Amino acid sequence: MAKSVKNRKRVAPTRRHLSMRHRRRTPHCPLGKSKDHKRNLVRMFMEMLNAVKLYHWNTHSFSQHKATDELHSRLSENVDKFMEVLLGKDASRLKHLDKKIALINARNTSDFKTRIHEYREYFVNMNTCFDSHRDSDLLNIRDEILADLNQFLYLLTLK
């Protein structure tokens, strides 16, 4: 004879259950497996910087030309700082990097804006990859990069 639902004994969730539940609710780390974080970051940073510079060279709009130049300059500075802080945390160097990096050449402003939104989403989800206490320095630099991208998206709305 089956026990009624009311009489079933409740079992406290285990750590495994809690971590699985937590994992389902939060977006996954965009950097992939932890052993590949640095390699994936370098690839993404280089692709982003190259995409901004290619758009800078190809645009016919003077305001977009100036805005992308400023964005590239700020991103380059913040990316350099981010990677130096990251590498300084464990006194490591980059090894076994991919030899090929995609060159993303946006066809028009709409495509480029979409790409910038994708980069922004990548950085927003990056907080799932780092510990908010131990890696607050990296997350602060990430926030500066997000501010640069958001300011640039605003500047694209100007004529």
Language model segments and positions:
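Arg/Lys-rich, intrinsically disordered low-complexity tails that mediate electrostatic binding
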Residues: 1-36
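Hydrophobic core segments within long, regular secondary-structure runs in both alpha-
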Residues: 49, 76-79, 120, 146
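Non-transmembrane amphipathic alpha-helical segments
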Residues: 45, 52, 82, 123-126, ...
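Disorder-to-helix initiation segments
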Residues: 30-42, 48, 108-112
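Helix-loop segments that flank and shape redox-cofactor active sites
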Residues: 47-70, 129-136
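Amphipathic alpha-helical coiled-coil segments
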Residues: 81-86, 152-159
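Conserved alpha-helical segments that form or flank metal/cofactor-binding pockets of metalloenzymes
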Residues: 63-95
